[in-house]
Amino acid sequence: MLGHLVGLVKVRVVRGVNLAVRDLRSSDPYVIVRMGKQKLKTRVIKKTTNPEWNDELTLSIEDPAVPVRLEVYDKDTFIDDAMGNAELDIRPLVEVVKMKIEGVADNTVVKKVVPNRQNCLAEESTIYISEGKVKQDVVLRLRDVECGEIELQLQWVDIPGSKGV
């Protein structure tokens, strides 16, 4: 299987902002991150619509064209309530990785991705080099819900011995 991987993406689910209320005056939110058959989950943060997760989840990348999908839920005793979803295209991040940029100052911005009708970006997303790593800061507007945004930070990780991107 390792031969098919092109790299890893560390997805830091930083926080939720103004998430929907699904319980009495609040929610107990968590995020599921999916890519292809992979499914990862943050911890549940109790009684808040502005959770601070800072949970780091790692996705194995085989095909960068497959979008990363986020689903936000309110943890309940019986059935968890949906609190919105979003998709993220990681191809812009991979394009910067392919440039193999070296020797630049920390936090040098290499690319910006602007919000449009084809993506879930709430604001411009920057891809930059930090400590020799390619990173991307993202704020996603949740769909299929009245309100809410999720802040992420992505970081590309090369796999020694893989074919790379």
UniProtKB/Swiss-Prot annotation:
> Could you confirm whether the keyword Cytoplasm appears in this record?
yes
Q: What is this protein called?
A: GTPase activating protein 1
Protein purpose: Mediates the transient calcium-dependent interaction of PYR/PYL/RCAR abscisic acid (ABA) receptors with the plasma membrane and thus regulates ABA sensitivity. Stimulates the GTPase/ATPase activities of YCHF1, and regulates its subcellular localization. Binds phospholipids in a Ca(2+)-independent manner. Promotes tolerance towards salinity stress by limiting the accumulation of reactive oxygen species (ROS). Promotes resistance to bacterial pathogens, such as Xanthomonas oryzae pv. oryzae and Pseudomonas syringae pv. tomato strain DC3000.
Q: What is the effect of changing residue 117 to A?
A: Abolishes phospholipid binding, but no effect on binding to YCHF1
Question: What family classification does the UniProt entry report for this protein?
Answer: Belongs to the plant CAR protein family.
Keywords, in A-Z order: Abscisic acid signaling pathway, Calcium, Cell membrane, Cytoplasm, GTPase activation, Lipid-binding, Membrane, Metal-binding, Nucleus, Plant defense
Provide the GO MF annotations for this entry: GTPase activator activity; lipid binding; metal ion binding
What Pfam family is a match, any one? C2
Provide the C2 domain boundaries.
1-105
- Localization in the cell: Cell membrane; Nucleus; Cytoplasm, Cytosol
Q: What is its main location?
A: membrane
Highest taxon, organism lineage: Eukaryota
Q: What SUPFAM superfamilies is this protein classified in? A: C2 domain (Calcium/lipid-binding domain, CaLB) (SSF49562)
Q: What is the effect of changing residue 23 to A?
A: Abolishes phospholipid binding, but no effect on binding to YCHF1
Entries under InterPro entries matching the protein: C2_dom, C2_domain_sf, CAR1-11
- State what changing residue 43 to A does: Abolishes binding to YCHF1, and partial loss of phospholipid binding
Q: Does the keyword Nucleus apply?
A: yes
The residues that hold Ca(2+) 2 are: 23, 28, 74-76
